[in-house]
Amino acid sequence: MKKKYLFLIMLVIPLWWSCGKEDIPANGEEEEEETIDWNAAANASSMTLVNQFWNSGGNYFNTDNSGNTTFQYWPNAHALDVLIDAYERTGNTEYSTYFDRWFQGVKAQNGNTWNNDFYDDMEWNALAMLRAYKVTNDTKYKDAVLELWGYIKEGWNDNAGGGITWKKGMEYSKNACSNGPAAILAARLYQEFGNEEDREWAIRIYGWLKSTLVNPNTGAVWDNINSNTGEINKEWIFTYNQGTYIGSAVELYKIFNEKAYLNDAVKAADYTIGSLVENSVLKSEGTGDGGLFKGIFIRYFTDLIQQERLDAPIQRRYLQFMKLNAETLWEQGTTQPAVLFGPNWRQKPGTSTGLTEQLSGCMLIEAAALLEKEELLN
């Protein structure tokens, strides 16, 4: 049995772990490897999110942990997602106690409405609140999700053959970031409530995304198409667009049980872990919005790993990738004892970091804890 170190939130002295084995003792027996207790690490990282970023006066998460109280709509959706991750993993009401406060604060900060100019931002909030509804059965979350879904569907037009636009007033710009999450949302709404129209929306959005913004040979997801010019931006390839395309394929696979969807997800995942990395670790995509990109990929990559019909050799390869990234972040990229993460998972951020970068790190550590709990990661 492997020994595990418990990482406590109040840890004072940084601890370091070695992936390699120690020298074999004189008696010829190898010492046991020391491994990370991902459950404890996730507790530490997710509580840090609350302790260092939560704005108790406004009931939302601040932009950084250094006093910038600027409200950002879409990162707050992912902060709720992390709280739900932690609550589902532990059952600890210390996490769920923030759900209602988040609901009140985020809506108030967004002008006392869930409506927003950016369709992708509304999609992220709808996805997070759909999860909140599932774990609480509180209908206010369901009502908010359905309200948002109504706004989101208004973003579809026939420019560039279909797709949901990125931003109100920019009907010509059709982006992967506004269609991947929308397809996931539509599919999950169908699975939750059984509305056939939602299933058709999921098929339609996914079909447009795959045929328009995905390289069929490599699985790379292109960023956007300008319907005024017909030009596709093939230079911008980001981990979060890869992730939401993977996520939408997995959700449709769950509905139809057709392996073709799983194959789509695998192709996109293989491209990501082969091309958007540095030495097998997801590369930095900067701060600000980019700080969240890797965490979004990790969330939907984890969903793919959990699929029972995923070929065993592929699953093992993906688990090795996850383990390497999580160990690298925890051992090389985490400021201890504060448990802070930066955009580069091989580099500690110091004492200050942004909400988006912290969220991506939290998502990775929570994913490792989930996979460990399911006895997939060892």
Residue ranges and their predicted role:
Residues 33-80, 86-120, 132, 136, ...:
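CBM-like carbohydrate-recognition segments
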Residues 241-256, 260-277:
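Oxyanion-binding "anion nests"
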Residues 1-17:
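Sec-dependent bacterial lipoprotein signal peptides
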Residues 96-192, 199-200:
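Extended ligand-binding groove/face enriched in aromatic
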Residues 48, 85, 105, 131, ...:
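Alpha-helical scaffold segments in carbohydrate-active enzymes
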Residues 186-189, 198-249:
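Active-site cradle of extracellular carbohydrate-active enzymes
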Residues 13-40, 44:
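Bacterial Sec-dependent N-terminal signal peptides
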